[in-house]
Amino acid sequence: MALKTFKPVTPSLRQLVLVDRRELYKGKPVKALTEGKSSSGGRNNLGRITVRFRGGGHKRVLRNVDFKRRENLNVPATVERIEYDPNRTAFIALITFPDGKQSYILAPQRLSPGDKVVAGESVDVKPGNAGPIGSMPVGTIVHNVELKIGKGGAIARSAGNYAQIVGRDQGYVTLRLNSGEQRLVHGQCFASVGAVSNPDHMNISLGKAGRNRWLGKRPHNRGVAMNPVDHPHGGGEGRTSGGRNPVTPWGVPTKGKKTRSNKRTDTFILSSRHNRKK
C-alpha cells in the first residue's frame, strides 16, 4: 500500500505521513473472534509503575489471531478480507473454512480477498500457506516462525518482517533473520510463507505529539533533565552530560550493554546479530 501525505494547512499535517489503508475492510471485526482488552497504564497488580511512559491511548478490542495454524490441516480456506488491527503493526486476514469456521491470521504481502490458503504437512510455496519449515525449499521467505513445536509463531511477526531459509541439516533448518542473526529452528516447527504485510509502516511520520498519546505513549523524560533523587544522571549546575556511562534509573548499564543471559539456547544461534557490526 502507498503512503499518504497531506496538504500542510496545520503544523501537524505538514510532517504527517500515514499508510493509505483505503483497500482495507472498513467494518467491525468478527465479534466471535474478539475479546476485551483492558489497559494497564504500565502498572502492575499493586498499582505501581513497572513500565514508564505508558498510559492513556484509544480503547482497543483484541483480535484473536491464530499464530499456530495447526487446526483444519490440509483444508483450503478462502480469504474473506484484509483488516486493520490496532494491536499490531501488520494487517490481519479473515479466512473462512468450508465448514463455515472463521479465524484471523497474519496477512502476508500479496495476499488478496478471494485467495485460497492452506496449512498442512506439504504445502505449495505461496503467500499465506503454512507448514513445517523443514518441508520448504531453501531460499523460501517465511514469517510467523515457531521456535517451539506447537507453541505458535514467535519470529518475524511485525510489519514488513520476514526470515529466509538458508540451509537444512539433521532435522534442523538454518534461518537468516532481518537482524543479521542466523539460527537453527527445528524442521517440525510451523512457518507461514511470504513476508508480513504493511512494509511501509517504517516510513510513517506521526506529525504531532498527540498522535503518540493516542497510541498510549506518554512523554519520555531524559535522566540528565531530572534531579539526583530521580535518576543517576540527574542534578548538576546548568546542563551536564550525566558524568558517567549511560545507566537506567536503577543504575544498570544501558545503551549497548549486552543483557542476554539465556545460555541454554546459545547453541541454536550460529551467527550473532552483533557480528556484522564488527
Swiss-Prot record:
GO biological process: cytoplasmic translation
PROSITE patterns in UniProt: RIBOSOMAL_L2
Gene Ontology cellular-component annotations: large ribosomal subunit
Biased composition (Basic residues): 212-221
GO molecular function ontology, one term from the record: rRNA binding
Transmembrane segments: none
Keyword annotations of the record: Ribonucleoprotein, Ribosomal protein, RNA-binding, rRNA-binding
Pfam families xrefs: Ribosomal_L2, Ribosomal_L2_C
Alphabetized InterPro entries for the sequence: NA-bd_OB-fold (IPR012340), Rib_uL2_dom2 (IPR014722), Ribosomal_uL2 (IPR002171), Ribosomal_uL2_bac/org-type (IPR005880), Ribosomal_uL2_C (IPR022669), Ribosomal_uL2_CS (IPR022671), Ribosomal_uL2_dom3 (IPR014726), Ribosomal_uL2_RNA-bd_dom (IPR022666)
Region annotation Disordered: where it falls in the sequence: 212-278
Subunit structure: Part of the 50S ribosomal subunit. Forms a bridge to the 30S subunit in the 70S ribosome.
Entry function: One of the primary rRNA binding proteins. Required for association of the 30S and 50S subunits to form the 70S ribosome, for tRNA binding and peptide bond formation. It has been suggested to have peptidyltransferase activity; this is somewhat controversial. Makes several contacts with the 16S rRNA in the 70S ribosome.
Family (UniProt): Belongs to the universal ribosomal protein uL2 family.
HAMAP family per record: Ribosomal_uL2_B (MF_01320_B)
UniProt name for this protein: Large ribosomal subunit protein uL2
Native source species: Methylorubrum populi (strain ATCC BAA-705 / NCIMB 13946 / BJ001) (Methylobacterium populi)
